[in-house]
Amino acid sequence: MNFNEFVNEVKDNIKLFLPKDYENAEVSTMECQKLNRAYTGLMVRKEGEMLTPTINLNQLYEAYKAQPGVTMETVCRKIADIVIEAPIQVDLKSILNYEDVKDKLFIRVSSAEANKEVLENAPHQLKEDLAITYHVAVGKDQDGLSSMFIKNDLLEQYGISAEQLHEDAMKSSPCVMAPEVSSIGALIDEMYQKNILMLTPDEREMLQETLQESSEMPTFFVVTNTDRIDGAGVIFYPEFMDSMGELLGNDFFILPSSIHEMLVLPDDGQVDAEMLRDMVKEVNATQVAPAERLTNDVYHFDTKDHVFEKADRFTERQKEKEAQAAKTEKAGKEQPDQKPKTKKHDMEL
């Protein structure tokens, strides 16, 4: 069964698996453009509902193909469960009222290049090749955060400028998505403590080896939020990088681990930015899902000049500074000594 057949099968049969109050529901699909991904979404809207969850059919189709024994009946039952259990309880008037949502704003970070088309229709700010976008937290439960992506039409509805939106989102983000900083070793140790009772002897030994290796690695810090979902934007919270610099007592490199977190490594002058870039590329290619990737670059924060930039640009700036300092020093050395002039007398004896 190809994807189009799968979509039609779901659309034609989904109501058979829903309660009676869905018999007059409208079933539709639409092409969704989201950050880091595009997909065909299914919506089942009951009479009188203004908002309804959009279910990612591409994701379900991939799961269906990966499990040959799964029937379309099983797929439809799963979708029906999602529709029933995850209605969006939102006051639409409240969502469209900026005063009601401005304390629920938060930022996300994504690849500007990978999301070029989406960003054309949404307010955003660029930080090098990373894009900051703005979102409204609609609801939060054990399954995660429901949110609404602010695009240009919603910004127009709010009647505010993109600059005002950015300012307000930066204020509210730390409250909506609280920051969290941990060392990688601490996170591995936390995982070890949580899972040790469920591990086989071989798995336990492997994890112990990982802990030993992590203790021998440079000190990386993980920057994310307390939910550890969509937490890469924390690095751009107001004064966060300055505070991180004070904590480390040094400049630092920033590695875009994924949309969920950034890695921070103190710049002690011994770290090779090119080596870090190669590491990011390898991890992206082998361990990070395409929808969760940021970029293959490495960034740097200069604590003295308070500058966030690509690591290679920082290196260029340092060379420019050194060249300018050498030029100034050379000019000072070449300056001729100014000897006092002998004053001529008008009359000689």
Where are the predicted features?
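TerminUS-proximal long segments
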Residues: 281-318
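Non-Sec secretion/translocation targeting segments of pathogen effectors
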Residues: 325-349
